[in-house]
Amino acid sequence: MLEFDTITAIATVLGEGGISIIRISGENSLSIANSIFRGKNHRDLLDIKPYSMRYGFIIEKDTGEILDEVLVSFMKGPKSYTAEDIVEINCHGGVLATRKVMEEVIKAGARLAEPGEFTKRAFLNGRIDLSQAEAVIDIIRAKSHISVKSAVQQSQGKISKEINLLREELLEIIAHIEATVNYPEEDLEEMTSDQIYLKINKILDEINYILSNAEEGKIVREGLSVVIVGKPNVGKSSLLNSLIEENKAIVTDIPGTTRDVIEEYMNIGGIPIKIVDTAGIRKTDDIVEKIGVEKSKEKIDESDLVILMLDSSKELDEEDKEIINYVNHRKYIILLNKTDIGDKIDLNDICNLNSRFIIKTSIKNGEGLDKIKNCIKELFFKGEIKSEDLFITNTRHKEGLIRAKESCIEALQTLKSTLSIDLVSIDIKNAWINLGKITGDTLEEDIIDKIFSQFCLGK
């Protein structure tokens, strides 16, 4: 284990609450806490058993004045979060009380931790790898139970295990090639080009399989952005209200009521969905409405999915067709709304659209909402979302896999173009290095520092 100084930070949100927790980690954590602690019957902390708590008071070292009534816990390294000795002081919640205790800890010899420094120490001390460390921040920022489960699985090493298996397979090929080339006099079983080709191809298939869920992984982590578009008064705001089951958007019979973008959140099958209700798209001389229309188009370009609403009680006009052409290059669902009062849209006019994603609805009567939700799941998750699936939720991990994939493809091409198998080891090493960047084994120190700087204090 590496040697570090002793650090401290407030591990809970600073504000009014039942308790605040001040975390101290490092070789001197227990002696620092003990120097400002007074236990019942004057007991100190030096004989505290690991993984137990002791009741007492934090005192101001200079005056002996009691600052707060506390419970102190002790976790002995390496069986702790950072793999170092950790002390946690549970004091009363509140900004002033917490800060006073924190000041005494720093006066006693601890240094204020940098953002993410506790988790960084867990990584540097070998308790977790980098992908597991990144999962910690994903757990904190998770927006749904699926994203929490996925992040917890990653923190337990689910991704690391897969990556390490791939690296072991690559390393085995490298070792065999180099042993064959460098020690020809030894009686080693020679690995032929065909054997290497088959092994690399197998690894490539495994990488492709992991990458196949990368888009779903991004959605699990960040959620979906869904934009509702259409002409004014087609039912966009009614749809938003129905989906979130609240009356957040104003609904009137007056076209152009919604002039700005309205954003709300809902959940479909455990996935967070940001629903964006936009201003009706039409030609207008109203300056404010024009700005709203431009914002609508911006939101379409930023979205993962467009829900285009058409009024089925009226025939399509040029404005409808213009909107259809605008969204046709994106993932979309077409809602033929107001079917309760008419069905005048000729389906031949929208025959260039995928009929699987055309839904007849009457939002006023609550018809078609389940179809919309099922369609979203079909578009992005092939109909079902399973928390036990292996999701690549991190863009950095995805990039590492793509680079490793490219190196494997180059290795296969090298094998096809040359009879010398030692040349292929360069490409295989590159694949091994790129996969190692995911777990942090081969990543540059400045990038590691940048990753941990995104964490909150106390974590």
Swiss-Prot record:
Q: What class of enzyme is it?
A: hydrolase
Per its database record, what is this protein's job? Answer: Exhibits a very high intrinsic GTPase hydrolysis rate. Involved in the addition of a carboxymethylaminomethyl (cmnm) group at the wobble position (U34) of certain tRNAs, forming tRNA-cmnm(5)s(2)U34.
**Per UniProt, where does Mg(2+) bind?**
S237, T258
Q: Could you say which cofactors this protein requires?
A: K(+)
Protein's organism: Clostridium kluyveri (strain ATCC 8527 / DSM 555 / NBRC 12016 / NCIMB 10680 / K1)
Cofactor binding description: Binds 1 potassium ion per subunit.
| Name recorded for this polypeptide | tRNA modification GTPase MnmE
Which compartments is it annotated to reside in?
Cytoplasm
Gene name of the encoded protein: mnmE
State where GTP binds: 233-238, 252-258, 277-280
Q: Where does (6S)-5-formyl-5,6,7,8-tetrahydrofolate bind?
A: R23, E88, R127, K459
Pfam families, sorted:
MMR_HSR1, MnmE_helical, TrmE_N
A single Gene Ontology CC annotation of this entry is: cytosol
Q: Name one GO molecular function term.
A: metal ion binding
- Chief place of localization: cytoplasm
InterPro entries registered for this protein in UniProt: G_TrmE, GTP-bd, GTP-bd_TrmE_N, GTPase_MnmE, MnmE_dom2, MnmE_helical, P-loop_NTPase, Small_GTP-bd
Family listed:
Belongs to the TRAFAC class TrmE-Era-EngA-EngB-Septin-like GTPase superfamily. TrmE GTPase family.
Q: Which UniProt keywords apply?
A: Cytoplasm, GTP-binding, Hydrolase, Magnesium, Metal-binding, Nucleotide-binding, Potassium, tRNA processing
Q: Which Gene Ontology BP annotations are present?
A: tRNA methylation; tRNA wobble uridine modification
